[in-house]
Amino acid sequence: PPVRREPISLDRFILLKGIPAGISLLLLSIPYGMTTNYVAMYAKQIGINATTGFFFTFMAIGMAISRIFSGKIVDRGKITQVISAGLYLVVFSFFLLSACVYLISWNNMVCTIVFFSVALLLGVGFGIMFPAYNTLFVNLAPNSQRGTATSTYLTSWDVGIGIGMLTGGYIAEVIITPQ
């Protein structure tokens, strides 16, 4: 007798209850994709003379610091508060990063300090947000769909980063440096 297989359905690949959170995560990972790929170009364009590779070092330090305390807060059931705090910190950091274009003409050293401080703050912000999102997705799913929940989380993350890289490349090529 033929083997009976369940029909393929969307809910085997994407956690339907997690779509709103997935859209939110996708939108948050767009600036992450832009920043991690084009921040060195931005620094060079505005005139920051420091080694921009340290930006990623400070970002990694911020992520490491965030892991010390954010997991404990999430374990106490404050997932949305952790995500909100990370979001506010990231938005504030991006405003500071955009201010560097004006700070550089005032004081190069202050601008460089702000630039690397932004990296630290972005690391903390993203470092507390993204693991909290993973917990959120897993908590939304029944035990039988935890793999689907993780798939939805990672798909949202990857698509957002991809859109961020494409958009950042377009901005860098067409808008910032027109021929």
Segments (PLM) and residue ranges:
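Intracellular juxtamembrane helix-capping segments at the cytosolic ends
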Residues: 39, 128-141
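Extracytoplasmic gate region of multi-pass secondary transporters
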Residues: 17-56
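A membrane-interface helix-boundary motif in multi-pass transporters
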Residues: 170-179
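C-terminal ends and interior cores of transmembrane alpha-helices
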Residues: 89-108
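Juxtamembrane intracellular "pre-TM" segments in multi-pass secondary transporters
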Residues: 2-25
